[in-house]
From Swiss-Prot:
Protein name: NEDD4 family-interacting protein 1
Region Disordered, residue ranges: 15-45
Cellular component, GO annotation: cell cortex; dendrite; endoplasmic reticulum; endosome membrane; extracellular region; Golgi apparatus; Golgi membrane; perinuclear region of cytoplasm
Alphabetized PANTHER family for the sequence: NEDD4 FAMILY INTERACTING PROTEIN 1/2, NEDD4 FAMILY-INTERACTING PROTEIN 1
Subunit structure: Forms heterodimers with NDFIP2. Interacts with several E3 ubiquitin-protein ligases, including ITCH, NEDD4, NEDD4L and WWP2. The interaction with NEDD4, NEDD4L and ITCH leads to relocalization of these proteins to exosomes and eventually to exosomal secretion. Interacts with SR1402. Interacts with SLC11A2/DMT1. Interacts with PTEN. May interact with phosphorylated EGFR. Interacts with BRAT1. Interacts with KCNH2. Interacts with MAVS. Part of a complex containing ITCH, NDFIP1 and MAP3K7. Interacts (via N-terminus) with UBE2L3; the interaction mediates recruitment of UBE2L3 to ITCH.
Cytoplasmic side: 2-116, 165-172
Residues the record lists as N-acetylalanine modifications: A2
One Pfam family linked to the record: NEDD4_Bsd2
Position of sequence motif PPxY motif 1: 39-42
Native source organism of the sequence: Rattus norvegicus
Amino acid sequence: MALALAALAAVEPACGTGYQQLQNEEEPGEREQTAGDAPPPYSSISAESAAYFDYKDESGFPKPPSYNVATTLPSYDEAERTKAEATIPLVPGRDEDFVGRDDFDDADQLRIGNDGIFMLTFFMAFLFNWIGFFLSFCLTTSAAGRYGAISGFGLSLIKWILIVRFSTYFPGYFDGQYWLWWVFLVLGFLLFLRGFINYAKVRKMPETFSNLPRTRVLFIY
């Protein structure tokens, strides 16, 4: 047994000299490629990310609200109050939106008319009686023309009532019915005054509405 161990010890140094440990040597090209594939350091990545986020903040991107603001809901009373305020009409400030009118424009002047149209329709209704009244009232669209036709027709009615009452060509036409004569006479007089008075009021409208907001006027004949 001792001889076997001595022989093994003598053989082992001789075998060890035949082997050499190879070092891990790499070629220069592979070493450069490995250095190029290495990831960048963490500090450079953090600096680039901070610069990117600073750029986004400077460009005007909206920041999200905080958690408290995003999760805070209004109470029931506040919600009802906001709803009630939204439904209230802004009536007190409405008059400030209107602009006063310096004068009537051409369209308003055509609706009112002038004295010439009033006199023309007045004489048409007075001379041609009901035919002149219908023609002048239907062919004119201005207030002066229609009020002139009404006034002229009223005076024409008075004229014919007086002719029939005191003429010898119509004897006994109103015998026993004098109340009917008074009814037509008063009716003609009221129509005559109505046309003149209403036209006088219409003529003053440009002065009345010159300092008021734009108003739509409805004429009732």
